[in-house]
Amino acid sequence: MRPGLICGAALALCAAFMAAPAYCADGQKAVEERNKQIAIEFYNAALNEKNWEKTRSMIGNRYVQHNLGAIDGPEGLKAHIEYLKKEFPNNHGEIKHALADGDLVALHVHNQRSPELRGNAVVDLFRIENGKVVEHWDVVQAIPEPEKAKNKNTMF
């Protein structure tokens, strides 16, 4: 084999190895961006539109619920949507931030059961698998009256 051919092949191989991390990072970023969009669309369909048919198409055959006050599985989610539709038809969550880390997406939300209420600061965490929402965690904190706050910062 000729030395020039060997050097050329070695350089091409080195270039491929050097480009691989950038390609993988770009691919991972694209997956995370898609996962964010899935979580946002899911949140809006389930909690803002309260549309079970649309929501059902966005979840997997299993839906693991980590909120201990909510029923596990797709039927539990359906019951929660029906409850919101009946008891809190004006319930609305404004997504303030969306962050993705691999298959996990966190949404920082200002949720109000009705427009005249201060509402809650919520962080919803969703796990996305094969383009479907399959798992959910949340943390909810009531927004205090301004005069009871210990600082002037907002929760959002």
Regions found by a protein language model. Name each.
Residues 123-151:
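Short beta-strand edge/turn micro-motifs at domain boundaries
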Residues 19-53, 57, 150-156:
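Short, low-complexity N-terminal intrinsically disordered segments enriched in polar/charged residues
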Residues 1-9:
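Bacterial N-terminal signal peptides that target proteins for export
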Residues 52-101:
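A solvent-exposed, acidic/Ser-Thr-rich amphipathic alpha-helical stretch
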Residues 8-18:
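Bacterial N-terminal signal peptides
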Residues 91-93, 117-123:
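Short, surface-exposed coil-to-beta transition loops
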Residues 107-114:
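Short beta-strand segments that buttress and anchor functional surface loops
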Residues 55, 59, 100-104, 126-134:
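Short, solvent-exposed coil/turn segments at beta-strand boundaries
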